[in-house]
């Protein structure tokens, strides 16, 4: 299963501090039983949530785990979260989040139904099954940044800002 959290903050003067906090947050999240990987991205496309984190999880039971409940959330950042961009969705359709290297981009397209092709790219379609369910389906694709095609304005382009972290990461 895939858990995707999208957000942004209202005080952009604190963006560097937010970025540092998020690195530690991801490190903690991959210590939760049932979370095997986490990676954070920032939007290169205006009009979309500025920050996206993608997690590989074993099941929705992760969200009721006592340890998860003790470490989840935004902590001191909660009052600064821009609610226009705050979305948490749980998806089925993929066991592990795709790896996006530094020179790749994560493409995200929310749709009512899966589509065969968008921009000539092969998409993985995820079905929303829990939490906010802000979209029925989310298409994701990882492409080389150098080969990024022209895309519709309804497709978000995200660049990785952390490596994919896992229980085996340093």
Where are these regions (language model features)?
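Macromolecular interaction modules
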Residues: 1-170
């Amino acid at each position: 299963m895939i858990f995707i959290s999208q957000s942004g903050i209202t005080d952009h003067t604190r963006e560097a501090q937010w970025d540092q906090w998020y690195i530690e947050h991801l490190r903690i999240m991959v210590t939760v039983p049932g979370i095997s990987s986490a990676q954070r991205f920032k939007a290169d496309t205006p009009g979309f949530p500025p920050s996206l984190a993608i997690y590989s999880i074993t099941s929705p039971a992760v969200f009721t785990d006592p340890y998860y409940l003790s470490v989840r959330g935004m902590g001191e950042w909660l009052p600064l979260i821009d609610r226009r961009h705050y979305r948490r969705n749980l998806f089925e359709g993929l066991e592990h989040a795709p790896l996006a290297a530094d020179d790749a981009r994560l493409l995200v397209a929310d749709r009512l139904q899966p589509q065969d092709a968008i921009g000539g790219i092969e998409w993985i379609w995820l079905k929303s099954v829990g939490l906010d369910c802000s979209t029925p389906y989310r298409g994701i694709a990882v492409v080389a940044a150098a080969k990024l095609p022209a895309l519709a304005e309804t497709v978000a382009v995200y660049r990785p800002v952390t490596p994919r972290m896992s229980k085996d990461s340093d």
